[in-house]
C-alpha cells in the first residue's frame, strides 16, 4: 500500500466500492487524502452495511475527516447518469462540493453547505452517526 501513496492526491470520491475486497481495515490510518464514500441503500451488488457503513464505523474514518453519504433507495446502477437521460446527474453537485471543500477552492459551493440530492432521492451524510 505505501508504494501506491501519492502526496499530490488530496481528496478522493468512491461510489459503491467493495472496500473490504480492496483495502485492509488497518490501512485506514495511512490514508492521507480525504475520502467521500457514496453508497446506495438498496445496493445488492456492493451492499452498504458490510462494504461502507461497517468499515467506516470500525475504522473511525469520520473522526479523521472522511465522509459517508447514503443515497436512499438507490441501487448499484442508479447512482450514475448518462447524457440525454431524463434523470438528473445527482452525483455531480455532491462530488464537486466535496472536492471544492477539500481543495479549498475560493467562492465555490461546498460539501458542508448541503443542497445535493433532490426531493425524490435523499442523500444523507451519516458520518457523524457512525
What are these regions (language model features)?
Residues 21, 30, 76-78, 110, ...:
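Residue-level preference for alpha-helix termini and adjacent loops
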Residues 1-27:
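Primarily recognizes the serine-hydrolase "nucleophile elbow" in alpha/beta-hydrolase
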Residues 12, 22, 49, 59, ...:
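Surface-exposed loop/turn and secondary-structure junction residues enriched for glycine/proline
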Residues 2, 67-70, 114-119:
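Preference for short coil/turn "hinge" residues that link or interrupt alpha-helices
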Residues 30-92, 96-97, 101:
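Active-site-adjacent alpha-helix of alpha/beta-hydrolase-fold enzymes
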Residues 9-10, 66, 111:
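Residue-level recognition of the N-termini of beta-strands and the immediately preceding loop/turn
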Residues 85-130:
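Catalytic active-site module of serine/aspartate enzymes centered on a nucleophile-bearing elbow/loop
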Amino acid at each position: 500500500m505505501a508504494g501506491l501513496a501519492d502526496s499530490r492526491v488530496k481528496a478522493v470520491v468512491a461510489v459503491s466500492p467493495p472496500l473490504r475486497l480492496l483495502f485492509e481495515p488497518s490501512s485506514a490510518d495511512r490514508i492521507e487524502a480525504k475520502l467521500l464514500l457514496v453508497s446506495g441503500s438498496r445496493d445488492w451488488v456492493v451492499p452498504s452495511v458490510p462494504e461502507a457503513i461497517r468499515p467506516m464505523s470500525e475504522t473511525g474514518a469520520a473522526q479523521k475527516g472522511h465522509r459517508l453519504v447514503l443515497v436512499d433507495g438507490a441501487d448499484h446502477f442508479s447512482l450514475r447518469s448518462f447524457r440525454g437521460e431524463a434523470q438528473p446527474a445527482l452525483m455531480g453537485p455532491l462530488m464537486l462540493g466535496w472536492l471544492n471543500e477539500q481543495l479549498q477552492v475560493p467562492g465555490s459551493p461546498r460539501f458542508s453547505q448541503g443542497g445535493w440530492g433532490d426531493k425524490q432521492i435523499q442523500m444523507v451524510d451519516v458520518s457523524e452517526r457512525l
